[in-house]
Regions:
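Short, hydrophobic/aromatic-rich segments at coil-to-beta transitions
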Residues: 1-3, 20-23
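Terminal export/targeting leaders at protein ends
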Residues: 7, 17, 31-33
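Short, exposed beta-strand/loop patches in secreted or surface proteins that constitute
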Residues: 14-18, 55-57
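Glycine-centered tight beta-turn/hairpin loop motif at sheet-sheet or coil-to-beta transitions
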Residues: 11, 29, 59-61
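Phosphoinositide-dependent membrane-docking surfaces
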Residues: 21-24, 30-48
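Alpha-helical transmembrane spans
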Residues: 3-4, 107-130
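Anionic N-terminal interaction surfaces
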Residues: 1-15
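Acidic, Ser/Thr- and proline-rich intrinsically disordered linker/docking segments
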Residues: 42-115
C-alpha cells in the first residue's frame, strides 16, 4: 500500500510504501527503509476536528509525521481522509505482529491536558480516524 501527503508548502510531498516487513519513506530523491520491528511508538492525533496525524517513532531515527492533507497551494488543501484512514488501518495490521510498538492517542484541543491514552493495534479508536 502507498500513501502520499504534503502537510505544508515548505515540505516536499512524502510517500510511504508499506511492505510485508518494513515501510519505505520517499521524500524527493531520498528513500529511507524502516523495518516495522524498530518502530517503538505510534501516536494518533486529532485537532480542529478535521486534521489527523499519525506519528511514528522509530528506534534511533527521526519521528515520521503522517497527515490526512495534501497542500497544493497556499490556499488549497486536498483532503485525503479516506486514503489516510485506510493507510493507518493497514499500518496497524502490519505493526501488531511485527513490532513491539506502544499505541496511544492525544487530542490537542486542550494543550494543557494532553495525556496520552493507550489502545491496542487491533482496536484503533474511531474518533482518531477521519
Amino acid at each position: 500500500m502507498e500513501y502520499t501527503f504534503r502537510p505544508s508548502l515548505d515540505e516536499q510531498p512524502t510517500t510511504i510504501c508499506l511492505a510485508e516487513y518494513n515501510l519505505t519513506v520517499k521524500k524527493g530523491k531520498q528513500e529511507t527503509v524502516i523495518p516495522y520491528a524498530v518502530i517503538n511508538e505510534v501516536v494518533l492525533n486529532k485537532s480542529n476536528g478535521k486534521q489527523f496525524r499519525a506519528k511514528l517513532l522509530p528506534d534511533g531515527g527521526k519521528p515520521i509525521v503522517i497527515t490526512n492533507t495534501y497542500r497544493t497551494t497556499s490556499k488549497d488543501v486536498e483532503d485525503r481522509s479516506r486514503a489516510y484512514a485506510t493507510f493507518v488501518r493497514v499500518l496497524h495490521f502490519h505493526l501488531k505482529d511485527k513490532s513491539k510498538a506502544k499505541f496511544s492517542t492525544i487530542v490537542t484541543a486542550l494543550k494543557l491536558f494532553r495525556f496520552p491514552k493507550s489502545y491496542l493495534p487491533t482496536e484503533i479508536p474511531l474518533e482518531f480516524l477521519p
